[in-house]
Amino acid sequence: MRDALLILATQRMDGEMFLEGRKALVTGSTSGIGLAIARGLAAEGAQVVLNGFGDREEIASLCDELGATHSGADLTDPAAIAAMFDEAGEIDILVNNAGMQHVSPVEDFPPEKWDQLLALNLSAVFHCTRAAVPGMKRKGWGRIVNTASAHSKVASPFKSAYNATKHGVDGFTKTIALELAEHGITANCISPGYVWTPLIEGQIPDTVKARELSREEVINDVRLAKQPTKKFVQPEEVAAMAVFLCRDEAQNVNGANWSVDGGWTAE
């Protein structure tokens, strides 16, 4: 599945790697959606800077695979973000993908978790964008792709911080799209539904136990209840959209929030 979808993500219109000579920084890219996007961009010739945590040997292997470099910057720390950009140099493509989730009734929501989600899911998007834009302006070209969520368009109970941050990412993206449009820079969101990642896969056994349901019931009646296709989105499908948004042919695709959710937000 991954290889087939990656072919779609990197299919060339002109037989050339259209991102040759471009540098891309993808946050939260050592696994899941971010890694799929990094692979898609690297396959089109981009020099990729990975960001995220994980096993050192696995990250080194990914860097070898993609010809990439890696920053382990903690994106909840503005100083660490500034240092990451100082080390990376000017960026042509910024993918703000890093994020986290916490589920709790609002009256029980730990304040420190609220602050942590806002710092990573929203403030880091601002700090990374602020650092990347001057170089993009100097070159007269740039692409900013922000991973939002179906929860940037609709809400779900017990996800107050996540819903708030993803709605914020949507509004921020539209604002900077207007600010930067005359500089050859576009900014767009991608809003996935439930994506089949190791994180989601690992949560299924706990949900089976907590709700006393079968694995199939958890997948179909809980996780996929809102996705009319009854299929998980694959990371490579999100990557395909991100790669397209970096093409010159997408220069007038700006300020949009693209759903990749099996029809969830069409209701």
Cite the ranges covered by each PLM segment:
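Substrate-binding pocket helix/loop in short-chain dehydrogenase/reductase
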Residues: P105-V106, P110-L118, I144, R223
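Short, small/polar-rich loop/turn modules that mediate ligand/substrate recognition or access, typified
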Residues: A181, T186, V253-G255
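Residue(s) in the substrate-gating loop at a strand-loop-helix junction
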Residues: S149
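Active-site helix of classical SDR
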Residues: T129, T165, T173
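Conserved glycine-rich cofactor-binding loop
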Residues: K23, T30-S31
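Short C-terminal tail/terminal secondary-structure segment
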Residues: A4-G15, V154, A242-V243, N254-E267
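Alpha-helical segment proximal to the catalytic Tyr-Lys
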Residues: P134, L178-E179, Q251
